[in-house]
């Protein structure tokens, strides 16, 4: 695996439970499974706390994942500290596996909640969505995009607060400005950045991704947030993702709401602002200032708002003189 400074080297062993024991982690039951490995509960004996251990098999994982996406995921998570993001503690590498030690969210995920209980009340949807908004505002203010927002990546702690997880497609958006520029001036260039790595699930993907076009990753995040909010209050996805051509057609139209759900007009308006074409789509700054979100917001993220406002102001001033950057 590349970027060796990201990981701690671990002794070679065939049994990952034995290796985890050496580091003080007593591995328990599996709580999640993915393409390249599984997530387990574990007890960290040195601090007497429960954690989550994501164990990735190098044999199952692709070279692209091991050499590009996994190091990027760890690098991103190492710089993040926010109450609505899953905390990263450490990463350990052996000859056959990579172990990522994370904060444990003991309440399952929001998708499981919806499948069990159905649509959220609007106050509960407002609570969870405003927490999601605060977490994404924090990311975007640091020029970081998630690119895989979906209900199953919104975990719940024991108090049923949202914890955004799975940063496998997250990235720090590059800037073409010299290091000597002010941080805010360098950051603003992210708004002129387009991605061409087509990440995430079709059901949550913006129309630009579905059409295979370079896309603004900040606006792809806010589209996914629109899908999430719709599903919270309706209990099903806004678009049929079983057929790609049908999905693409549906995402070009204004989303409709079922008559048998009581949803406030404020909530509907916000969803419509997020589920629209990129040139008119709400940014995270628009969302965080929205009247419906403000009713449920536990606190005003004044630092993030100031950063985002400065970035938007600079972007609007300089965008005519900037060329688009396209990366993966």
From Swiss-Prot:
Modified residues (Phosphothreonine): 197
Tissue expression from the record: Expressed only in the testis.
Catalytic activity: L-seryl-[protein] + ATP = O-phospho-L-seryl-[protein] + ADP + H(+); L-threonyl-[protein] + ATP = O-phospho-L-threonyl-[protein] + ADP + H(+)
SMART domains noted in UniProt: S_TKc
Residues in Protein kinase domain copies: 25-293
Protein's UniProt name: Testis-specific serine/threonine-protein kinase 4
Cofactor(s) of this protein: Mg(2+)
CDD domains documented for this protein: STKc_TSSK4-like
Family of this protein: Belongs to the protein kinase superfamily. CAMK Ser/Thr protein kinase family.
EC number: 2.7.11.1
PROSITE patterns given in the database record: PROTEIN_KINASE_ATP, PROTEIN_KINASE_DOM, PROTEIN_KINASE_ST
Organism: Homo sapiens (Human)
EC main group: transferase
Chain's gene name: TSSK4
């Amino acid at each position: 695996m590349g970027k060796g400074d990201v990981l701690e080297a671990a002794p070679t062993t065939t049994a990952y439970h034995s290796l985890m024991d050496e580091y003080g982690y007593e591995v328990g039951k599996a709580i999640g499974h993915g393409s390249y490995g599984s997530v387990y509960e574990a007890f960290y004996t040195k601090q007497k706390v429960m954690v989550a251990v994501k164990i990735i098999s190098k044999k199952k994982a692709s070279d692209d994942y091991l050499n590009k996406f996994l190091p990027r995921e760890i690098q991103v998570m190492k710089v993040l500290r926010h109450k609505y993001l899953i905390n990263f503690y450490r990463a350990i590498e052996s000859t056959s596996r990579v172990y990522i030690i994370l904060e444990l969210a003991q309440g399952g995920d929001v998708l499981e909640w919806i499948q069990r209980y159905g649509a959220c009340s609007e106050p509960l949807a407002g609570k969870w969505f405003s927490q999601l908004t605060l977490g994404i505002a924090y990311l975007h203010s640091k020029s970081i995009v998630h690119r895989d927002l979906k209900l199953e990546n919104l975990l719940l702690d024991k108090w049923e607060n949202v914890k955004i997880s799975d940063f496998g497609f997250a990235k720090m958006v590059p800037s073409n400005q010299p290091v000597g520029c002010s941080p805010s001036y360098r950051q603003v260039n992210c708004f002129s950045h387009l991605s061409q790595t087509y990440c995430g699930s079709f059901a949550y993907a913006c129309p630009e991704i579905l059409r295979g076009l370079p896309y603004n990753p900040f606006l792809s995040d806010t589209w996914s947030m629109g899908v999430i909010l719709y599903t919270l209050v309706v209990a099903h996805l806004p678009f049929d993702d079983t057929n790609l051509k049908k999905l693409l057609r549906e995402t070009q139209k204004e989303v409709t709401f079922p008559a048998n759900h009581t949803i406030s007009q404020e909530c509907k308006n916000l969803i419509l602002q997020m589920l629209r074409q990129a040139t008119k789509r709400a940014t995270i700054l628009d969302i965080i200032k929205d009247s419906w979100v403000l009713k449920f917001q536990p606190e005003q993220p004044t630092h993030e708002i100031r950063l985002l406002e400065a970035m938007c102001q600079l972007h609007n001033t300089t965008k005519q003189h900037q060329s688009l950057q396209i990366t993966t």
